[in-house]
Structure formats: structure tokens, C-alpha cells
């Protein structure tokens, strides 16, 4: 299996090289050269546990890693999850399920991909006898999950940019209280979009990337999206057979990577009926899927901070398929978008995609309603998924974070403050963070001084 850039101006790579590279040298994002058809394999995959299913799925793409080695990497990636199902599918009512994706070490769905990515990096460092420096930007959960995927690993250093004062206190503590010498929490003055823009400019500096063997953990990394395909497949296989063909996955998302993974799985032959994109008040994706226009707005802080995003980095992968896999067209559109901050899609399948937008008042109301009706405590991001469910479909709401990560919001909504032992332990640890300006030069200078 080879992987190509959405912009078509760089050679195709094998899996390990595409993962290590992160962002393609031409500024594009890697995708499989061909999309495999899994439809004939679905019956064979039924009944597999999560790690075994992930091994079988990743084996289709990671063809340059021996099967036994890949199996060990995958198995090790899910040993720190606290629920034996890894991704339990909870029925709440007839035709309504919650897929819990927060039983990993940082209590967020990002652990599914980033525990695996950390082990893939460790394998590459050992196999190639090289060090690697990892750079990422986060609006909340990605940074903590990336750090806990690489914490203390020999031959690695990880640098995570996040908007100072715009992540929850617990999210910041998960990044800045590790005490690990290879972890650097970089609090930048600006928004997540500012951090992501600076990150892309740093990666565009080919000399700097090469000198420091720089790689990415953001959802621009191919391995992230592929790993996230697995929990859609796992949930689909655990639904009653009569419900599978009518399932709509409801996905709280700001960066589009989570829903993109499900859509890619659908393109691999898994019969998923549709996807509902659930946004908070930062609603660029809601506007895209209701009007066809993708236009950047101003980021507004919300009760669901991990979705406080206006530039979705995985937009380019969706664009590549929507524009008929035409790299020249992708280059032209991305240049136009960079210049104007807007793009209008000529068409997309509105029967597959729908969207909802939830403001802070509604988030609090939905948390209370879901708790009252179903006895279920949803975090603020998951709450966005419960708005305007389609009664004609089987709804699977992706629960993307533990409610314990947002105690103030939950307490205000239902009068009970959720807790988790791993989060309580963080409160006594010192915060070690580095405040930086959100400029490529400042970030490069810091990495120069700390890289392995």
C-alpha cells in the first residue's frame, strides 16, 4: 500500500514513511493511493475484540510492518484502557446508542489514535536507530493524548502548542504536570487556529523538518485518521444486524478528522447510512453542511472547548475526494481559501451528511435532559451530539470525553460533580509550561533549544 499527497507534488510513500513525515512536503495530506474494499471481510471480522480488529484493519495499510510486529504494537496500544470492551457501545433507548471513546489514559477519544501513534513512533526509532521530535497543536484533548502516547519514550521529544487560557484547567494539567523530561507544553498567545497556522508554517520549512526529524501528531497525520476508522467498524459490528444498514453516527467535531474517519470507512464498503456533524457555536462545519459554503469566522470560547475551531485541518482530505481526486484542483482551492478564507462546494451528498449547531445554553440544557431521561452523564462535547437526532435512523452518538474532565459544567447542569482518580491526582502536581508568541520563528527557536 502506498500513500499519496492530496496536492500531488511529492512522491508516494509507504505507511511508515508517511506516518513519520506527517504533513507532505508539498503542503498536502497523505491518503491511501487506492481505497480498499472491506465489504467481503465484514463477516470474518465479526466477534473480534478491539485490539484484534484494529490489527486486522491496520494490516491492510501498514504493509511495510511485519504482521506479528504490527499485532504487538496494536495490542500494546490498548492495554491502558480501563473498560474491557475498549470502546463500549451503550444502549440508551430504542434506536439510540452511545459509543464511549474515553476509557483511555487521558479520558478522551484521542487516545485511540495517539496511543497507537506513540507506539508506531517508538517502533520506528528502534528499528531505524533514529530520534524523532514530535510537534502538535491542540484545542484541548489532542495534546494530552499525544503526550501520554510518548511520555518518557527514549529518543523522542514532544512539543505541544495550545492556546493559553482557552483549554480547561484539567486539560492543561494533563499536558503540563507530567514531570517528563521529553515533554514540552507550549502555551501560546492566541487561539487554536493561530497555533495550527504556526504549526503548518513550521512544517513547511523543509530544512528545519529534516534537521530535527520533525513529525506531526495532529489529525493531519495519516495514522490518526486510520486508527479512528476502527471504532466505527467496531461499533457497526456490534449493532444488531437489522440496524446496521440504517445507522447514523452522530459525531461531535470541530476539526473534521473524527467524522472523516467514519466517512472513509463508508467508502471502504461498510454500509453506514449517514453522519451527523455536531458542532458547538463555532459552526464552520454546520454552515458547510447546511449551505455548502466553507467560510472562516471568529473563534468564540464555549463550554465545549475542544471544538472551538474555525479552520478544520482535515477539510483538505474531504476536498480531495469531493473534487474527484484531482490534486491540481485541490491546490487551486486551497490557494483560494488561504487568500479569501472561503470556498463554496459545488455539491456533496446531503443524504449522507447532516449537521447541528449547539450553543452554550443548549449544551447545559441537553446535559440535564439526557441525565433526566436516560440516567446518562454526557460531557459538553457529547451533549452537542444529542441535539436534533434523526428519528428515522438508528443513532450512535460518539461520546468523545469523560464528563469528569468538565466538572464545573456538569455540576451546573445536574448538581453533581463527576470525578476520576487520575484527574484528582493531577491537582497536587506543579504546572510546567512555556509561554510563547504564536509565531513560527519563536516556535522554531524553542525547538532548536530542546530537540533530541
Language model regions located:
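PLP-dependent amino-acid enzyme catalytic core
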Residues: 1-452
Amino acid at each position: 500500500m502506498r500513500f499519496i499527497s492530496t496536492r500531488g507534488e511529492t512522491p508516494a510513500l509507504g505507511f511508515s514513511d508517511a506516518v513519520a513525515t506527517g504533513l507532505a512536503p508539498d503542503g498536502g495530506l497523505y491518503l491511501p493511493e487506492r481505497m480498499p474494499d472491506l465489504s467481503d471481510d465484514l463477516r470474518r471480522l465479526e466477534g473480534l475484540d478491539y485490539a484484534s480488529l484494529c490489527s486486522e484493519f491496520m494490516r491492510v495499510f501498514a504493509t511495510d510492518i511485519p504482521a506479528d510486529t504490527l499485532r504487538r504494537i496494536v495490542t500494546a496500544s490498548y492495554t491502558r484502557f480501563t473498560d474491557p470492551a475498549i470502546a463500549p457501545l451503550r444502549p440508551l433507548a430504542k434506536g439510540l446508542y452511545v459509543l464511549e471513546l474515553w476509557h483511555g489514559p487521558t479520558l478522551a477519544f484521542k487516545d485511540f489514535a495517539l496511543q497507537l501513534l506513540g507506539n508506531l513512533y517508538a517502533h520506528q526509532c528502534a528499528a531505524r536507530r533514529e530520534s524523532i521530535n514530535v510537534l502538535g497543536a491542540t484545542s484541548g484533548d489532542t495534546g494530552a493524548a499525544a503526550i501520554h502516547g510518548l511520555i518518557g519514550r527514549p529518543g523522542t521529544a514532544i512539543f505541544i502548542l495550545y492556546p493559553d487560557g482557552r483549554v480547561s484547567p484539567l486539560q492543561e494539567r494533563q499536558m503540563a504536570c507530567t514531570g517528563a523530561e521529553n515533554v514540552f507544553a507550549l502555551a501560546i498567545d492566541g487561539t487554536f487556529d493561530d497555533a495550527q497556522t504556526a504549526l503548518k508554517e513550521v512544517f513547511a520549512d523543509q530544512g528545519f523538518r529534516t534537521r530535527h526529524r520533525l513529525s506531526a501528531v495532529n489529525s493531519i497525520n495519516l495514522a490518526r485518521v486510520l486508527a479512528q476508522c476502527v471504532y466505527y467498524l467496531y461499533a457497526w459490528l456490534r449493532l444488531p444486524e437489522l440496524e446496521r444498514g440504517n445507522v447514523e453516527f452522530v459525531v461531535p467535531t470541530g476539526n473534521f478528522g473524527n467524522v472523516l474517519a467514519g466517512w472513509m470507512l463508508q467508502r471502504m464498503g461498510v454500509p453506514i447510512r449517514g453522519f451527523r456533524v455536531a458542532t458547538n457555536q463555532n459552526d464552520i462545519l454546520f454552515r458547510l453542511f447546511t449551505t455548502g459554503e466553507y467560510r472562516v469566522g471568529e473563534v468564540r470560547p464555549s463550554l465545549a472547548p475542544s471544538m472551538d475551531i474555525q479552520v478544520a485541518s482535515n477539510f483538505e482530505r474531504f476536498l480531495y475526494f469531493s473534487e474527484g481526486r484531482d490534486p491540481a484542483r485541490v491546490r487551486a482551492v486551497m490557494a483560494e481559501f488561504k487568500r479569501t478564507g472561503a470556498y463554496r462546494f459545488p455539491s456533496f451528498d446531503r443524504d449522507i451528511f447532516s449537521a447541528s449547531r449547539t450553543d452554550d445554553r443548549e449544551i447545559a440544557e441537553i446535559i440535564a435532559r439526557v441525565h433526566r431521561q436516560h440516567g446518562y452523564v454526557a460531557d459538553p462535547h457529547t451533549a452537542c451530539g444529542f441535539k436534533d437526532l434523526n428519528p428515522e435512523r438508528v443513532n450512535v452518538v460518539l461520546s468523545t470525553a469523560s464528563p469528569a474532565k468538565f466538572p464545573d459544567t456538569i455540576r451546573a447542569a445536574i448538581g453533581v460533580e463527576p470525578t476520576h482518580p487520575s484527574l484528582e491526582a493531577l491537582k497536587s502536581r506543579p504546572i510546567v509550561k512555556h509561554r510563547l508568541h504564536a509565531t513560527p520563528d519563536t516556535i522554531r527557536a524553542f525547538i532548536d533549544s530542546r530537540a533530541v
